[in-house]
From Swiss-Prot:
It comes from Vibrio campbellii (strain ATCC BAA-1116). InterPro entries: Ribosomal_bL12, Ribosomal_bL12_C, Ribosomal_bL12_C/ClpS-like, Ribosomal_bL12_oligo, Ribosomal_bL12_oligo_N_sf. SUPFAM superfamilies: ClpS-like, Ribosomal protein L7/12, oligomerisation (N-terminal) domain. GO terms for cellular component: cytosolic large ribosomal subunit. Transmembrane segments: none annotated. GO terms for molecular function: mRNA binding; structural constituent of ribosome. This is Large ribosomal subunit protein bL12.
């Protein structure tokens, strides 16, 4: 008489955690295997994480040659007052907007670069 998979599963379900650990160790020893989980390659996981990025930070790297136009662009993009926008531009590199979607980040970058600023999207 052979034991079915269902009978084995029922027997394991009735065991305590310690008994299951002992069973696994005995199986590893008897069959010369290990019960280690498969490890995902680090490179593949990193590539997927980069592809799944949905929030971006827009960083003002420098104001460039036309500081006044950049301050106006910063005011329009952020809704800051003149004093705050000037302080942000003077303090470059500085985060301009954080946690925005890809389309907004790209549009903001294009707008600021058109005004003469150097911008990074991270």
């Amino acid at each position: 008489m052979s034991i079915t998979n269902e009978q084995i599963l029922d027997a394991v379900a009735e065991m305590s955690v310690m008994q299951v650990v002992e069973l696994i160790e005995a199986m590893e020893e008897k069959f010369g295997v290990t019960a280690a989980a498969a490890v995902v390659a680090g490179g593949a996981a990193g590539g997927e994480a980069a592809a799944e990025q949905t929030e971006f930070d827009v960083i003002l790297e420098s104001a460039g040659g036309n500081k006044v136009a950049v301050i106006k662009a910063v005011r329009g993009a952020t809704g800051l007052g003149l004093k705050e926008a000037k302080a942000l531009v003077d303090g470059a590199p500085a985060p301009l907007k954080e946690g925005v979607d890809k389309a907004e980040a790209d549009a903001l970058k294009a707008q600021l670069e058109e005004a003469g600023a150097t911008v990074a999207v991270k």
